[in-house]
Amino acid sequence: MKWFNTLSHNRWLEQETDRIFDFGKNSVVPTGFGWLGNKGQIKEEMGTHLWITARMLHVYSVAAAMGRPGAYSLVDHGIKAMNGALRDKKYGGWYACVNDEGVVDASKQGYQHFFALLGAASAVTTGHPEARKLLDYTIEIIEKYFWSEEEQMCLESWDEAFSKTEEYRGGNANMHAVEAFLIVYDVTHDKKWLDRAIRVASVIIHDVARNNHYRVNEHFDTQWNPLPDYNKDNPAHRFRAFGGTPGHWIEWGRLMLHIHAALEARCEQPPAWLLEDAKGLFNATVRDAWAPDGADGIVYTVDWEGKPVVRERVRWPIVEAMGTAYALYTVTGDRQYETWYQTWWEYCIKYLMDYENGSWWQELDADNKVTTKVWDGKQDIYHLLHCLVIPRIPLAPGMAPAVAAGLLDINAK
């Protein structure tokens, strides 16, 4: 049974994409885009986070490129928010979180700033007159504070004044840096961003994870030595969970295939390890995380022996798994990846997609019942595009540039 690159399946993906776009519109608040609850309501107590606002700027840049009326206004709102309350006019960069009364968290987080970079780069594809200026400023901040020339890797975080950096290096922030760097490369054509993406992937995946059965280390010291026991006493941490986070493993796999495709588009021979490691990451996720306790779903975390730690099934890992399945099929032609893609869609239809309240449930327990152990509410819609739009575009250029270039469904029949 064939789904990939068929017009009939892509039409279904498009319908679901529009449903998700409509749900996300509820997140508009004066300071940016807010945290959505399970019924699409704003959770005012959560404040306005940079990472959500920047991701929604990216999302509606894609929607604008798809020709969705109203999306450009949301891009405009996102750019104004990035230049408004979230932006630190004194020290530069962006606060982690604000609300209507002022700054909630003044720290400068790499994870969040890399989404600012993604959002700004995606906005450039809409032709918004302020987008390139925002991107140039964001690049300046990234170059100055978050890219280490000495380490040739990304730093994790700073205090408000950019005077003290954290004695910690994070795989999650560096992964999203790779994602953003690829889009910056697409819109600027400056190859250093592609080179940086390759460098980061080579360290975290090819040098470390490959030698750890593709169980990706998330936490490192300042010398890039893994910290395997980090947060062992707080295993369900939203951003720094203990052990391995299989959703990140498989997400890394897709990013490496985007690098692979970007090199091919330059008529350069990609290193063989990009594809080999992408396969390894996919296989490790299936091996350790898919239904390890008898119930379907991808568990949130595992230990270093591959045993489940946090058994909740969070939404984004399986979404990323479907995007990576498509990417691997595109590169290899191996039908097993389409079979997994179909299996995972059946799971999502059965358990995750919420047609009554909108969007998808963010988290299920080990019995696939809705819960809030790790996440509360439905936050944003960013990850969902990775199973709804990625299967409709080439692997290079990246999402917003590809859609803006008219490449949506270019291979569909």
Swiss-Prot record:
What switches on its expression?
Induced during growth with sulfoquinovose.
Q: Which superkingdom? A: Bacteria
What's the record's pH-dependence note? Optimum pH is 7.
Alphabetical GO biological process terms: 6-sulfoquinovose(1-) catabolic process; 6-sulfoquinovose(1-) catabolic process to glycerone phosphate and 3-sulfolactaldehyde; carbohydrate metabolic process; protein hexamerization
Q: Which reaction does it catalyse?
A: 6-sulfo-beta-D-quinovose = 6-deoxy-6-sulfo-D-fructose; 6-sulfo-beta-D-quinovose = 6-sulfo-D-rhamnose
Name the EC number(s).
5.3.1.31
Give the enzyme class: isomerase
Thermal dependence of activity, per record: Optimum temperature is 47 degrees Celsius.
Regulation of its function: Significantly inhibited by Cu(2+), Fe(3+) and Co(2+). Partially inhibited by Mg(2+), Ca(2+) and Mn(2+). Also inhibited by ATP, ADP, dATP, TTP and GTP.
Q: Which CDD domains match?
A: AGE (cd00249)
MF terms (GO), sorted A to Z: identical protein binding; mannose isomerase activity; sulfoquinovose isomerase activity
| Key word Repressor present | no
Which Gene3D superfamilies does the UniProt record give?
1.50.10.10
Q: Where does 6-sulfo-beta-D-quinovose bind?
A: 55, 111, 172, 176, 238, 251, 362, 379, 383
The residues annotated as the active site are: 248, 383
InterPro entries cross-referenced by the UniProt entry: 6-hairpin_glycosidase_sf, 6hp_glycosidase-like_sf, AGE/CE, AGE_dom, SQ_isomerase
Q: Give the phenotype of cells or organisms lacking this gene.
A: Mutant fails to grow on sulfoquinovose as a sole carbon source.
Note whether Mitochondrion occurs among the keywords.
no
Extract the SUPFAM superfamilies matched here: Six-hairpin glycosidases
Instruction: Report the sequence similarity comment from the record.
Output: Belongs to the N-acylglucosamine 2-epimerase family.
Function, in words? Catalyzes the isomerization of sulfoquinovose (SQ) to 6-deoxy-6-sulfo-D-fructose (SF). Can also catalyze the interconversion of SQ and sulforhamnose (SR). Has a clear preference for beta-SQ and little-to-no activity on alpha-SQ. In vitro, can also catalyze the interconversion of mannose, fructose and glucose, or lyxose and xylulose, but has extremely low activity with glucose.
The protein's matches in HAMAP family, at most eight in alphabetical order, are given as: SQ_isomerase (MF_00998)
Subunit (UniProt): Homohexamer.
Name of protein? Sulfoquinovose isomerase
